Amino acid sequence: MSKGTLFDKVWDAHTVQILPSGQTQLFIGLHLIHEVTSPQAFAMLRERGLTVLYPDRTVATVDHIVPTEDQARPFVDTLAEEMMQALENSAKENGIRFYNIGSGNQGIVHVIAPEQGLTQPGMTIACGDSHTSTHGAFGAIAFGIGTSQVRDVLASQTLALSKLKVRKIEVNGTLPPGVYAKDVILHIIRKLGVKGGVGYAYEYAGTTFANMSMEERMTVCNMSIEGGARCGYINPDDITFDYLKGRDFAPTGDDWDKAVTWWRSMASDADAEYDDVVTFDASDIEPTVTWGITPGQGIGISEPVPTPESLPESDRAIAQEAYSYMQLSPGTPIKGTKVDVCFIGSCTNGRISDLREAAKFAKGHHVANGVKAFVVPGSERVKVQAEAEGLHKIFLEAGFEWREAGCSMCLAMNPDKLQGDQISASSSNRNFKGRQGSSTGRTLLMSPAMVVAAAVNGKVSDVRELS
């Protein structure tokens, strides 16, 4: 059993009681809500005559169903408009802080909370969204929850949870040129499998993560769930504190000093005990692209699509399914695969540093004929910052569309969707069948820089070769 880890410390600090079931009733320090998983939860509260217990610990925004082109109200999609109105009314009714379109603070929930300093070390955080593990980059324990659990947190500010085991994932060394945080997490998921983390919290450690910026760390923690882990985190350090200082909800004055002292104390002890330890060498990682229908089906850009014989027997059935769905033949190079759509954005890679890096490669190039390419900032703040730096002009001159903030093509809940059997190069986090809006649409996951290379060449390319 793990002991002395950040996970243990945060868990213990937020334990209300041990329930008869053996589960822990855990206090939730911050509850993030959006328009998709909250309407039913609020309806259940009304049915029982309940109100939100701690509205000051709840923050709402809209992201999943928001159009990124025409945001005029009412939305063309009547269901989306209905969901918008439901959250607007529920937030007002319960006194919940709500960041609506045009507020200057709206955006993908996992982008806006960190950028405003809402996400802090030592917290427990819950949200009705799979990628809540993003917030673990700050040394928080963050869980994605279902609608009934959203109801529970609204009503009681607690969750009934079983304690997880802790796996330490060490990556050491300097990342080679053209290799990013996205490649690191895709590599980890490839090696450990999409079910490898079931029952675990992942602690990311080692010199590679220590040298990452906060936004890079968020990319890594964001995809913990894709490896089966319920949450993933990185111990807070000076990089964390420097990022937080001065943000809207960060402590100030003496409270800041006290907070930093406490945050440091929550980091895993040097002699912490883990349930499992796995190590990787950063020099073994190259630009990575998924070829199949799970985030675990990734390969380096120099590798061919794997043959069934090269895979463990347990992976062969889904590989056969992937060959058929993706229309890719085993043994053929992934490099050179034609793409139709290129998407940069999402809670994985829609932050300002992602856009800066993508713009660096887009500058002086142009999107290939026949390719639709677009960039979607993760928040209104990111969009304003990008435009202040002139990044939008670089993208527009290169033939990319420049959109409003939202989840966009990460998932098929808004107008940004694939058509027919189009294939996309995407900086998002999931490549499941039909994920991007078409039952036959195909998704290749990669870093924003690699998406630019694909857009420019009209095919999967090595960004290191983009002149």
Curated annotation (Swiss-Prot):
Question: According to its UniProt record, in which pathway does this protein act?
Answer: Amino-acid biosynthesis; L-leucine biosynthesis; L-leucine from 3-methyl-2-oxobutanoate: step 2/4
Q: What does the UniProt cofactor note say?
A: Binds 1 [4Fe-4S] cluster per subunit.
Q: Pfam families, from UniProt?
A: Aconitase (PF00330)
Keywords from UniProt, A to Z, are: 4Fe-4S, Amino-acid biosynthesis, Branched-chain amino acid biosynthesis, Iron, Iron-sulfur, Leucine biosynthesis, Lyase, Metal-binding
Q: Does the keyword Metal-binding apply?
A: yes
Top EC class, one word: lyase
The Gene Ontology biological process terms listed for this entry are: L-leucine biosynthetic process
Give the catalytic activity. Answer: (2R,3S)-3-isopropylmalate = (2S)-2-isopropylmalate
Write out the residues that bind [4Fe-4S] cluster.
Answer: C347, C407, C410
Q: According to its UniProt record, which cofactors does this protein need? A: [4Fe-4S] cluster
Q: Name one GO molecular function term.
A: metal ion binding
Ranges annotated as spanning the membrane: none
E.C. designation(s): 4.2.1.33
Q: Which family does it belong to?
A: Belongs to the aconitase/IPM isomerase family. LeuC type 1 subfamily.
Which NCBIfam families does its entry note?
Answer: leuC, PRK05478.1, PRK12466.1
Question: How the protein assembles, per its UniProt entry?
Answer: Heterodimer of LeuC and LeuD.
In UniProt terms, what function does this protein have? Answer: Catalyzes the isomerization between 2-isopropylmalate and 3-isopropylmalate, via the formation of 2-isopropylmaleate.
What is this protein called in UniProt?
3-isopropylmalate dehydratase large subunit
- Origin species, per record, is Crocosphaera subtropica (strain ATCC 51142 / BH68) (Cyanothece sp. (strain ATCC 51142))
